[in-house]
C-alpha cells in the first residue's frame, strides 16, 4: 500500500471519528478545505508540516496518520 493511500485512509477515519467535516477540519487546521479533499482522495501528498497541523486538530500523534492499519 502506498503511503499516500495510508494517509488518506487514516485521515478520513480519524476525521470521521471526531465527527468533523472536511471543512471543519480545514478551518481548525487553518488550511484550505479543498486540500483536505485532495489528501483524502490520494490526489496530493501531505507535507510534514501539514501532517503536524492535521494531527494537532485530530489530537493524535502525526505518526498515526502514517501508520498502516489492518
Regions found by a protein language model. Give the residues of each.
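A detector for short, charged/polar N-terminal pre-domain segments
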Residues: 1-6
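DNA major-groove recognition helix of helix-turn-helix/homeodomain DNA-binding modules
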Residues: 49-64
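Recognition helix of helix-turn-helix/homeodomain-like DNA-binding domains
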Residues: 31-44
Amino acid at each position: 500500500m502506498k503511503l499516500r493511500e495510508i494517509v488518506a485512509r487514516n485521515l478520513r477515519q480519524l476525521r470521521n471519528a471526531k465527527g468533523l467535516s472536511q471543512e471543519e477540519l480545514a478551518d481548525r487546521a487553518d488550511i484550505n478545505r479543498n486540500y483536505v479533499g485532495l489528501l483524502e482522495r490520494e490526489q496530493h501528498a501531505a507535507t510534514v508540516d501539514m501532517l503536524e497541523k492535521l494531527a494537532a486538530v485530530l489530537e493524535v500523534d502525526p505518526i498515526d496518520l502514517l501508520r498502516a492499519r489492518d
